[in-house]
Structures are given as structure tokens and as C-alpha cells.
Amino acid sequence: MFSNVNVDYCKTLGCKNLGVLNSVDYVAQGKNILCRECGYLFPVISERSLNLYRNIVNHSWRGVIQQCPVCGSTSLKKYGYSAQGQRRMYCHHCDKTFISLEHINTTPRRTQLALMIEQGVSLADIRNSLLLNSTGLNRELIKLAREANYKESRQFISAFDISLSTRAFRVKYNGSNNYLYILVTAEEQSGRVVAISTNYSPLAVEQHYQYTSSYEERMPPGTLVHHVQRKELLTMRRETLFDIDYGPAVLHQNDPGMLVKPVLPAYRHFELVRILTHEYTLNVQHYLDQECFILGGCLMANLQDIRHGRCHISFVKERGTAPVCLEAVSRLFLSGGVRNNVWRAFSTRDYSMAVCNLTGSKKINDMKRATLKSASGFINYVERHPFLPSINRMSPANVASTLDYLKHLWNRQLS
């Protein structure tokens, strides 16, 4: 998570070049690279921009994740304590030391801030009550989010198999009609949210990876089959496969950060998900929103587990409330687009679901278990939360911190 990565390799499942850098089979074709082994193109993703973004947004996880924040090694040993009494760790790989969090000290002000967010108190009342200006509120929210992430990172329960659902959604910011792009991954058995990522970077990356579109890709009315096929058609029309248009997104001129293309947070997001869960489980099933770069991020983070058959990935679309036992007629259809994947659609009077098992079992009974229920549940929780009007008036940085705390509130109510 803290070491640099390069993801410019073939992402075709079953291809011998999957995950292989600089293969002799690769031929550059403009912004893409052709893999002559499988015949598919994959877009070039800037190694510099991806690692800049990862290093910036992962900074708040230093000491929370048991990895060296300098080189990413897990070969560590205890190395005494700091002057403040915090555990110090030594990295065998790079000979650096760092502070490992064993507890986080909160403050009465931060405790009161957390309570006011939970109750949906307005931003003006929070600032007046806690005597916070814009800078002070930003600092307190960052600390509150770090405290929440620390607590959540130690709450996982071991399980032989887990299913994780991932969805994308949008939240307004700065009191405008601009949107932040957000990914959320939740564990299906318990409903707990594992991780949240946004496309806001506190510092700028390469200009080419700044999100600049004001257009929104929209789905016309229709069945899930039509939506799947329409999504593939929209993806094919993009200048680059990962150049999604999710709506307008402009920052204030005095904001030092950047809204990056969603491909960067997608690749970082699944790294975080895997690090937070891999110690507690053996086999993982990922259910994903239908989006090519979300699949790419999941593939990169779980490459070794996919090769060993311990990780499986499916695209899922659903509408309505899933019944306890899905007894529905199913039919196969092709998605069209670049890959023309085979999907299976299930439908009842009140519920419909379409699934594409990219790896793993193709049995109908196994495919019936596919769902995005837990990720959708958290999105609905955010959209109904009394603090949402205040979130919509915050800066993107504060929105990201507040969502991390809402994740903690959501998980706490499930305990």
C-alpha cells in the first residue's frame, strides 16, 4: 500500500500476460497497449500520477496499517517507544522506524463534534458551539476520520469465506451542483462497510489526470439488460476506457487539491480493501458495479489470490429489494461492447438482478447469491442522514473525512 506500483499490464482474465509487465506481446497503440496474446487493448495508466495519488491519500493510514510507510514492507519488529509513549516499529527492509498506533487519544471537542454530526446539527451551529473556523474544522474532521478508521481497522471478525460488494455514488459539495465520485465496499454477511474512497486528492497530480468533464453519462429507462448493454456502449464511446463522465466537478480556486479521474481512486481503493480484510479470511467473492476501471482496480489488488482460486469477481446490477430466497426464471444475454461478456438475468415481480461471473462458478444457484445489498444500504444511509445537507456545503476534503466517520456510525449500529 505504501510502495510504488505499475499497473500497465494486460487485464484479460485467462490471458498468460495477465499481470505481466513489459511483455514482448505488448504493442503500443496511441493511449492504449495491444496484447497480441489475447487480442485486447488496455489503456495506459500513468505510473507517476497513480503513485502520487496513492502516496497522498494513504498518508492518513500510516501507523494504522501494519506496513512500513516508507517502503511498504511487512517485515517489522517492535523498537521501543516514542517520547510520547507510542509504540515504535523498525522495518527490516529499509531500516526506517515509524510510530504504530495502539490507541488514539480523543478530546472533548472531538467527542462533541462526533455527536453533533450524528445528530445532524448544522455547520453554523457546530462552528459557533465549538469555536471553530474553517481551518480548525478541517483539522478536527481529519483527526475524527483517522480515529474512526483506526477503530474500524480492528473490528473485523475472521471468516473462511466473505462476500464484498462495491458500488459508486456521488455527493454534492461546496453548496453547489458539483459532485464528488465515491466508492464504497461493504461485507455482505454483516453489512459492515470496509472502506470508502473519493476522487479528491489534497495535492495535485499530473494535469492529464484531473477530472474536467461537466457531462453525465445517463441511462435511459429500460430493463437491466438494456442498462448493461447501454453501459457497454457508453464505455466504448469514451476517448479512453476509464474516462467516465459522472457529472460536473469544479473546485474553488483557493483549494490546493485536485479532483482526479476516478480510475486513480479505484486502483487505490481495492488495495485498501484487501489490506483490511486479507488477514481475516481465506476466500473472497467480489460483487462489483459494472465499470471497467473498478474491475481493473479489483484485479490488480487481488491478482495473486485470483491466480490461486481464492478470489472471484462478478459484475452485478440489481433493482428492487432482494427476496430471502430468489426463485426466478433466468435467461442468458450478451453485454455487447469490447468484451461482449455473458450475463444471466433473474427477475420477479418486485426484484430483478443481472450478474456476470468473470471468474469462479457459473452455476445458476451460485449466481443467485450475487447482490450489492450492503453497499447500497450504506448509500441509502448517507442519502437519508440528517447531516447530509451540511455535507453538501462542505469542501471535498471535509466531505471525505465526514464520510469516514459516517462509515463508523453505520458499522456501530450493526454491531
Model regions and ranges:
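Short, flexible, mixed-charge glycine/proline-rich loop motifs
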Residues: 1-9, 25-29, 54-65, 80-85
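Acidic/histidine-rich, metal-coordinating catalytic segments
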Residues: 282-296
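Short, positively charged, Gly/Tyr-enriched micro-motifs
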Residues: 42-43, 57-61, 65-161, 168-170
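A short acidic (Asp/Glu
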Residues: 138-140, 292-302
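Short, cysteine/histidine-rich loop/knuckle motifs that typically chelate Zn2+
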Residues: 9-17, 37, 69-73, 93
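Short Cys/His-rich Zn2+-coordinating modules
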Residues: 16-27, 45-56, 71-78
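RNase H-like nuclease fold core
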Residues: 149-277
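Charged alpha-helix within mobile-element recombinases
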Residues: 325-414
